[in-house]
From Swiss-Prot:
Biological process according to GO: protein targeting to membrane
Signal sequence, renumbered to the chain: none
GO cellular component, one term: endoplasmic reticulum membrane
Active site: 177
Name by which UniProt lists this protein: Palmitoyltransferase SWF1
Keyword Acetylation: no
Topological domain ranges for the Lumenal compartment: 1, 83-100, 212-233
Residue intervals of the DHHC domain: 147-197
Enzyme type, top EC level: transferase
Protein's membrane topology: Multi-pass membrane protein
């Protein structure tokens, strides 16, 4: 009964994960899949609003506890699956041998180790010490000099962000991962990638073992024979589903590394791309207060040029002749991402030891 419940919850969570990750992609626009995703997000917002209300009533402690439900639930599900695999599937493998036993147990240990490392490692809390060796500077396009976090009241270095869940600012912020209840940033991105790779290894290798365990058995009899066949067949189906989702998500992060952006920065670059699409982003010479780019706006019927940093008016119609304005027509051709040093160098930077 417990195993059946876990399987059902696993299937539901995998479908929900797929909807959240890919339901808004252009391929699914104006389809039932996007509508399901929007409904899921709407329900999630209502639930989170209730959580925040109840959390306030309990002096901010409830949400901290609830944040651990997903990683604890993940570890519990994985542990039960491991137990079922060792009990039912492993005996079906003829003469597994020492090497195969080693790889099986190593894969299991790697799951626990990577989860612990990703969940409890420092993502990159901002201190005066680590700022001295922090390599990134503002590009004056999506990150600017002199920015201060309105919550922490500390200086915000380039590529950092405040996490509302952890209530802290982190260097090279990527995203807050619910599966580990931790932010992914400057110091622990390597453990996050290890977490993903260890899951891909578990799903791929585990699925392969389940397939070979079932090979001598007629597929028509899998669901109608003994419990071991049923468990192994279910594992094969689950591994086949989850490895696709996990692999796609991992390749998505590899694509971000290739582009030289983080998940957080992708949204910022999307805003820049939107301004370019509207034809209102300009490069200026000479720069004003170290700002090299401005946005054209209309004030009282006249064109003005405002700061991307704080939306102050930097250039009025009366003094526009003092500056050289060049319209940015393409993000790819006219703008340079100073944080992109090529895929291999980007990867080395992200997997910082």
């Amino acid at each position: 009964m417990l195993f059946t419940l876990i399987v059902c919850l696993t299937i539901i969570s995998s479908l929900a994960t797929f909807l959240l990750l890919f339901g808004d992609s252009p391929s699914f626009r104006n389809t039932p899949i996007q509508k399901l995703r929007n409904s899921l997000l709407s329900i999630s917002r209502d639930i989170f609003q209730f959580y925040h209300w109840l959390d306030e009533k309990l002096n901010g402690q409830l949400l901290k506890i609830l944040n651990w439900l997903v990683p604890v639930g993940y570890v519990m599900v994985v542990t039960v699956c491991f137990q079922q695999f060792l009990t039912h599937t492993l005996p079906m493998l003829s003469s597994p041998g020492l090497f195969r036993l080693f790889t099986i147990y190593f894969s299991m240990v790697l799951i626990y180790a990577s989860t612990i490392l990703a969940a409890f490692s420092d993502p990159g809390r901002i201190t005066t010490i680590n700022l001295k060796s922090y390599p990134y500077t503002p590009n004056q396009l999506i990150f600017f000099d002199g920015k201060t976090c309105s919550t922490c009241h500390i200086a915000k270095p380039a590529r950092s962000k405040h996490c509302s869940v952890c209530n802290q600012c982190f260097l090279l912020y990527d995203h807050h991962c619910v599966w580990i209840n931790n932010c992914v940033g400057y110091y622990n991105y390597k453990w996050f990638m290890l977490f993903l790779i260890s899951n891909i290894n578990m799903l791929g290798y585990g699925g392969w073992l389940c397939y070979w365990a079932l090979t001598p058995v007629s597929w028509r009899k899998i669901t109608s024979t003994n419990n071991a066949n049923k468990v192994t067949g279910i594992f094969l189906i689950l591994c086949s589903i989850f490895i696709v989702i996990t692999t796609l998500f991992t390749f998505l992060h590899l694509r971000y590394i290739y582009l030289g952006v983080t998940t957080n920065e992708l949204d910022k670059w999307s805003e820049i791309d939107h301004l370019v699409g509207l034809g209102v982003l300009y490069q200026i010479e000479p720069s004003i207060a170290n700002e090299n780019y401005v946005e054209r706006a209309i004030l009282d019927g006249n064109a003005v040029y405002i700061s991307l940093k704080d939306e102050r008016i930097l250039i009025y119609n009366s003094n526009v002749k003092n500056f050289k304005l060049q319209l940015i027509q393409s993000v790819e051709d006219d703008l340079v991402n100073i944080y992109d040093h090529g895929f291999w160098n980007n990867l080395i930077e992200r997997l910082k030891w």
